[in-house]
């Protein structure tokens, strides 16, 4: 009855409490709750997934549209996170096989539909349309809109950092969109800001677009592309800012600049850390060990976010009456199966897509674009083509084949065709003020 006793007990992290008069069933439930919780949760989660497994398998065996693919990917991600928490490794392996089958079917779906989509026929929301369709409608002169593009953020990584963000923000729309191909920053993110497809960007801005073989940064003109896009969309008179964060020190400086951004109609912030993390995992042994699989990769993302300037930036935005759009340019996939490719020295280095001439490859491993201009992709010469790796494959040259197979196996790569790379989050939120 003493409130102070209860407060002190709860503050001391007691496991549970019983209210007199105590019944035997209360004692049994309290013991079960504290001793058997993990086992009971694991059993219930496993049972629920086994039921859902059949539903997902039936869906995969049918002909699905783009919205159904989004739902399947959401479900697979949900169960991946749930089973990870429950710790049932045997069921996690079954889910892994189901995801592999889903990616195999998704690859066929993309091969059959991508060219129509890129021409605007029955297309899902894609990279080059998100500013026009999802950002500009929120812009006003009385309330700032923030667009945060976290490079290389997969849907599962979003679900991991989401609970922390929702302490200060309310979700208005939790949506997916489809990245263009290649699922690489120079193509996808330039398309986002310019509101055009790559060959259209090259035509409009020949001095600003860089092809794979060109030296120098490939995303150096995003601000110019953004402002040109806003001008074409009738928002040229609106105040807009663009900020790219590529290191910790600059991120901390941006935290202090957020209060001054509230008078702008649109503030775009590009955050590069997650992309650097995936590339570092290939190059650095210590990162390889920290992020050995998807679960560890998610854990590393959560740890980074909790201690990053991005979290502080969001805390500052939360103090304003503002709209917030969080999205990304593409995802990434853990690659495990090598596919041999032969090409001349001008072929690009990416392991998930190749462009060039005189390419030799196994046709069943790739989505090939023999006429890239039909897919709005720039070409180096008239005989250039693009190929994209399917599922969790990665391209390896014939020279030093075994050495490179071993080096790149179980690393995170992007540029190809998979659900993880192409189906990506775009979340519309508002502050809780």
Residue ranges: model-predicted function:
Residues 5, 16, 22, 28-433:
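Feature captures the catalytic ectodomains and active-site-proximal regions of enzymes
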Residues 9-15:
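As written
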């Amino acid at each position: 009855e003493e409130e102070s006793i209860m407060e002190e007990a709860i503050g001391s992290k007691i496991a549970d409490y019983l209210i007199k008069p105590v019944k035997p069933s209360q004692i049994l439930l309290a013991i079960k709750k504290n001793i058997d919780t993990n086992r009971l949760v694991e059993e219930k989660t496993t049972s629920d997934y086994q039921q859902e497994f059949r539903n997902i398998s039936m869906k995969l065996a049918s002909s699905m549209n783009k919205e159904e693919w989004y739902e399947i990917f959401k479900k697979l991600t949900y169960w991946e996170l749930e089973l990870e928490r429950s710790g049932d490794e045997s069921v996690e392996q079954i889910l892994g096989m189901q995801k592999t089958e889903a990616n195999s079917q998704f690859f066929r779906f993309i091969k059959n539909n991508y060219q129509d989509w890129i021409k605007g026929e029955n297309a899902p929301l894609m990279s080059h349309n998100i500013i026009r369709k999802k950002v500009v409608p929120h812009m006003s002169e009385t309330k700032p809109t923030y667009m945060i593009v976290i490079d290389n953020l997969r849907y599962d990584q979003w679900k991991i950092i989401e609970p922390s963000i929702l302490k200060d923000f309310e979700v208005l729309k939790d949506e997916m969109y489809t990245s263009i191909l290649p699922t690489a920053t120079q193509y996808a993110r330039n398309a986002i800001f310019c509101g055009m497809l790559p060959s259209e960007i090259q035509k409009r801005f020949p001095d600003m677009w860089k092809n794979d073989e060109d030296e120098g940064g490939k995303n150096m003109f995003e601000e110019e592309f953004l402002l040109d896009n806003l001008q074409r969309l009738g928002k040229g008179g609106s105040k807009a800012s663009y900020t790219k964060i590529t290191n910790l020190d600059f991120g901390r400086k941006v935290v202090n600049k957020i209060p001054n951004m509230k008078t702008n109609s649109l503030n775009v912030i590009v955050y590069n850390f997650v992309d650097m993390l995936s590339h570092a995992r290939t190059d650095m042994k210590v990162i390889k060990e920290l992020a050995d699989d998807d679960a560890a990769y998610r854990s590393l993302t959560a740890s980074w976010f909790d201690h990053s300037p991005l979290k502080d930036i969001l805390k500052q935005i939360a103090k304003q009456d503002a709209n917030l759009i969080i999205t990304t340019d593409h995802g990434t996939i853990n690659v495990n199966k090598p596919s041999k490719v032969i090409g001349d020295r001008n072929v690009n280095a990416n392991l998930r897509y190749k462009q060039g001439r005189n390419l030799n490859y196994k046709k069943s491993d790739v989505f090939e674009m023999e006429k890239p201009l039909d897919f709005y992709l720039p070409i180096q010469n008239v005989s250039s083509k693009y190929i994209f790796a399917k599922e969790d494959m990665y391209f390896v040259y014939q020279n030093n084949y075994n050495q490179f197979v071993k080096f790149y196996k179980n690393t995170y790569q992007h540029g190809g065709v998979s659900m993880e790379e192409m189906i990506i989050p775009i979340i519309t939120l508002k502050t809780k003020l």
